[in-house]
Amino acid sequence: MRLFSSKVNSSAQIKDCSTWYPQPGQHISIRTFRELNQVPTSKNTSTKMESQSNGDNSKSTADLQEEVSSLPTTHTQRH
């Protein structure tokens, strides 16, 4: 089991993010992890980033709504 744990653990840890811990020789930043999370929720992050930069949630959402309404009718076909 010692040979089993030493080799399989290294590969299994990479596959499982929950049980994966950075080793002393590896350098992992939290930014890369956040970037990976931003990909599926790009719509939510873009709205949050705008609200943080502007400081007004109502303004950013209103601007987004205006942009959506100004888009061509191909966007409204989804509704």
From Swiss-Prot:
InterPro entries: Gemini_C4. Keywords: Host-virus interaction, Inhibition of host innate immune response by virus, Suppressor of RNA silencing, Viral immunoevasion. Residues 1-79 are annotated as: Disordered. Residues 1-13, 38-79 have a biased composition (Polar residues). One of its GO terms (biological process) is symbiont-mediated suppression of host innate immune response. Belongs to the geminiviridae protein AC4/C4 family. Pathogenicity determinant. May act as a suppressor of RNA-mediated gene silencing, also known as post-transcriptional gene silencing (PTGS), a mechanism of plant viral defense that limits the accumulation of viral RNAs. This is Protein AC4. It comes from Bean golden yellow mosaic virus (isolate Puerto Rico) (BGYMV). The lineage of its organism: Viruses, Monodnaviria, Shotokuvirae, Cressdnaviricota, Repensiviricetes.
